[in-house]
Amino acid sequence: MIKLKENDVILFQGDSITDGNRGRHSDPNHIHGHGYQYILASELGANNIEKNIEFINRGNSGDRISDLYGRWKEDCLNLKPTVLSILIGINDMIFNWEHQSGSDADRYEKIYRLLLDEVLSENPDTFIVIMEPFFGDKPEEELDNFFKSGIGAFQEKAKKIAEDYNAVFVPLQDLFDSYRDKTDIYKLLWDGVHPTTAGHQLIARRWKECVKEKLESR
């Protein structure tokens, strides 16, 4: 069980994987969406119910790293998170494939660092979690090769950023790859990108494994 601090504000940020078809209003039945962030909010919330914890989901379907920056003040800085968890990157590859309008790995890194600098300038004690972008398979060979040959650069950038900012890095590619000999990868990532219910559960477990010790030692 992960123990949180009194009045922690835990913010999940990212793209559609984090969005999870979340509600855009105040209805508490829907505001967290479905996915790993809902699993974490429900478990951590129940285990810390006396501590007035707030869980916020601001994942936005289709977002690239540049889109995240465009809404950063409203959807991050103004919310004053004490714990910030980010999963972003796969859409930059998708947009580059379709429209040449995503960031390459170098620009991804520059914007990512800018996002974190702004957060830490307002609250240097913000606990940051950087989740690794990941990919399964695509049936189209050319598209599959494009993703598999390119995503490594984004993953390396995310890991390096986590190291430089003393953030927790949550590796996810190896998690899904470890199931390739056990099951059809599409049972975990139904279209090669978006997790199934089981896939989200695996992400939530990995998040807790990586975060627990450092989060509790704040």
Please describe what each predicted stretch is.
Residues 19, 46-49, 61:
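Short helix-loop boundary/capping segments at the starts of domains
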Residues 14, 59, 132:
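Active-site beta-alpha turn of Rossmann-fold NAD(P)-dependent dehydrogenases/reductases
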Residues 3-6, 39-54, 67-218:
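Alpha-helical cap/lid subdomain in secreted, periplasmic
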Residues 26-46:
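Short catalytic helix/loop segments, enriched in acidic residues and glycine
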